[in-house]
Amino acid sequence: MARRRSKKLGGPTLSYINHEKSFNVNILYQVLQWVFLVFIAVFLGIAVIYAFGIRASVVGDSMEPVLSNGQEVLINKIAYQFSAPKQGDVIVFRPNGNENAHLSVKRVVATPGDTVQIIQGKVVINGAVYVGDRADDTKDAGVAASEIVLGPDEYFVLGDNRRSSEDSRSANIGNISRGMIEGKAWYHMKGKNSEAGRIE
């Protein structure tokens, strides 16, 4: 009795179909992985720029010779999320918390709980002359002619160029509250008196 030949079915085999599905899944996985990495890179880039790369311009010569008029500084916006401003820090703040006011750049000379007074051109903190002072005699004492006691959230700031600075000595500025501070000025771009570099 003659054997009947089996007919081969047309179309792709089961193994080929499984291979094609596996290939498509791998491509999809690689695409999703690439999209995820791009998203992470963009997110980190934006976060770094926001945290360390926001710029502010110095207005006037109140911070000379360290910073000159029009010189740009970079703001570290997360520095004071983990620690408080320290004496000697150069900060960026909005005077009186006014969102429409131009950002101001000044140096912290006294911190919460300190007493401040300007006596005969000398800045006196807690009864001692401010040793970190690199400025000339502070002729205009302003409101600091009388002793000032800083509250638990207040800072006393001055410009390095005391003869041309509107700062905490002025009744228009006064003590700076923590909520007014945008961040720490940590890097300056090239200016007329200096190359780009970290702010000391």
Residue ranges of predicted features:
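PP2C/PPM family metal-dependent serine/threonine protein phosphatase catalytic domain
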Residues: 125-143
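Short, surface-exposed secondary-structure edge patches
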Residues: 62-66, 79-84, 107, 113, ...
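Structural motif
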Residues: 71, 86-90, 114, 154, ...
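Beta-strand-rich cores of mature extracytoplasmic or soluble domains
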Residues: 144, 148-200
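Solvent-exposed loop/turn segments at secondary-structure junctions
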Residues: 80-81, 97-99, 116, 123-124, ...
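Protein maturation boundaries and topogenic segments
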Residues: 1-102, 176-180, 184-200
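Mid-length scaffold segments of soluble, non-membrane domains
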Residues: 103-128
